[in-house]
Amino acid sequence: MSADNESRTGRRAAGGGTSNRQWWPNQLNLHILHQHSALSNPMGGDFNYADEFRKLDLAAVKKDLHALMTDSQEWWPADWGHYGGLFIRMAWHSAGTYRMGDGRGGAGSGSQRLAPLNSWPDNVNLDKARRLLWPIKQKYGRKISWADLMILAGNCALESMGFRIFGFGGGRVDVWEPEEDIYWGSEDTWLGDKRYSGDRDLENPLAAVQMGLIYVNPEGPNGEPDPVASGRDVRETFARMAMNDEETVALVAGGHTFGKCHGAGPATHVGPEPEAAPLEDQGLGWKSTFRSGKGGDAIGSGLEGAWKPNPTTWDMGYLKVLFKYEWELVKSPAGANQWLAKDVADEDMVVDAHDPSKKRRPMMTTADLSLRFDPIYEPIARRYLANPEEFADAFARAWFKLTHRDMGPRSRYLGPDVPAEELIWQDPVPAVTHQLIDRQDIAALKGTILASGLSIADLVATAWASASTFRGSDKRGGANGARIRLAPQKDWAVNQPARLATVLQALEGIRQEFNNAQSGGKQVSLADLIVLGGCAAVEQAAKKAGHDVTVPFTPGRADASQEHTDAASFTVLEPVADGFRNYQKAKYAVTAEELLIDRAQLLTLTAPEMTVLIGGMRVLNANYGQSKHGVFTRQPETLTNDFFVNLLDMGTVWQPTAADKDLFEGRDRVSGELKWTGTRVDLIFGSNSQLRAVAEVYGCADSQEKFLNDFVAAWNKVMNLDRFDLA
């Protein structure tokens, strides 16, 4: 067959065709549990980024970055001969996708270089910033990730323009495929805003106002130039990104001290974004046919101009101009709503970025003007204007928080520029300064705990409640710190406060008795004791099933204080649902099984790990409220594979108890006798074909030992998710 004939037959490559997801749009997405495997990572399984970063000459990298700032390239000329504004925007937009609702987004994975972020409208022309960085990345290779380099470039941009930064911590590890677990919104058009309902209520966990934007629409809500209404959007969005009003004003005013917006001509001249660009453009997008398409002819956001004179110098110009002048609404050359200062003094005129013979009036976006006209922002901005040192410190701290918020505790930061000051948003836990318990102590404490009168279910549920707050997204939560004994965690409904208080009181008594009996400085923390209690309970439950297993335990956790716990910031860690405890706080638009997958992904669990944990937690009787839903066993608190055996039993017929199909009854197929009750979370392991395949492994007659070993391994993983000292 000729090549032409073969082409006409419509031959297709592997991976094409109608996908399962297209056939069944509501199919459970288990792929998010199996992202970022070694199969997609070119660095190899032995690569340790932290070790490589420690070999890096950070001072040399910074020197090269400083030199780059003024090394203007013909293919993408620097505004005023300085790339500082471009790199600040790149770093800001890398970090600015973070939202505290689920901890996802942020700068920690270098995802700006991948879809969809590399092609968001708000990231227009940041592809050029990353290409400008490529020679430096190429030079230092594996010793610095793209994720770290993008933030470091933003820091060096600030320094090169006269600003003193707060510090820098390395340690961000690149991913090699898009982060598909992140819900960016349900809109199917750029700048769509289906995420709102009611009186501009923004859908959780989203923070940005429209699809493809990092923060707010700079022209105002839905493009309407209303500074007061914009202030409401700014406050909501920045709050969801973990910033208070003072931090918000500092970030906006500080960031807009530098650089300019680009809107030299109509957006119709701009070509497709990087993911849609033709092959020959080699990953660069937004090619413009407007004149030269670059420099003074560049088209980006559609807004045009700089906020203040001297856009490559740190000074108070932004706030001075903001309050000094009245502002008139105009259209940019690209047709965007923006504001220009009226009757501008010559000293405040802005020299054109590419033609020093021309001067421009300062501009503001509608969002900028919210700092002047919002009743809360305005006095903060005026205070900063009157106190330059306070403003500089506020911006430095807010910028550091912005760029490090998703990295977890300070102990994860790498490099010589990590600031010494410990900040409350880092969820500080005291250093362990005492001698740790040894193997004999561990065995003795296990015996004491099991003899305390606390049940296996009590101990398992408490250890799980403590450890499972961890979020792999922003590395918050976990058992270290024992914050389960502090507000707000001790009062969360999912933790059954009365029962929790009883368990903690008993464990605290054991802790005090043990510590008081020591003479050589050896101590045990409550954080360690909570986890140890869970491990002892799992071992006891396995013993009841006729098996001797040892659950790994490594001491070294410490107890945090209420003083060093920002209770308000911890409220977002409260589970709206925890399928592992068969808990759901309320009725939601998404199904219980989808919420389970979401939580499993935050716990960095695979589908097999999630499956074996569910089966074990059910027979351990660890449900919220001691409910019997999903407890498919006649011998609770005994670690068997009964959950899987009975779920897969064809002698049982399942029917929903109500129209909402949230709760189900399992009856004997012949007699109709009620055998079990279960939730959607329980039944999904028999319904979903992929999860059923895994469940069948654990339901086999010869699987008890494998079930035990796999459960212990998954349990140990969850208990140690925040033990970064063990990595």
From Swiss-Prot:
It comes from the Bacteria. Residues 1-22 are annotated as: Disordered. Its cofactor is heme b. GO terms for cellular component: cytosol. There is a cross-link at W92-Y215 (Tryptophyl-tyrosyl-methioninium (Trp-Tyr) (with M-241)). One of its GO terms (molecular function) is metal ion binding. Formation of the three residue Trp-Tyr-Met cross-link is important for the catalase, but not the peroxidase activity of the enzyme. InterPro entries: Catalase_peroxidase, Haem_peroxidase, Haem_peroxidase_sf, Peroxidases_AS, Peroxidases_heam-ligand_BS. Signal peptide: none annotated. Its EC number is 1.11.1.21. Keywords: Heme, Hydrogen peroxide, Iron, Metal-binding, Oxidoreductase, Peroxidase. Heme b binds at H256. There is a cross-link at Y215-M241 (Tryptophyl-tyrosyl-methioninium (Tyr-Met) (with W-92)). Belongs to the peroxidase family. Peroxidase/catalase subfamily. Bifunctional enzyme with both catalase and broad-spectrum peroxidase activity. This is Catalase-peroxidase. It comes from Geobacter sulfurreducens (strain ATCC 51573 / DSM 12127 / PCA).
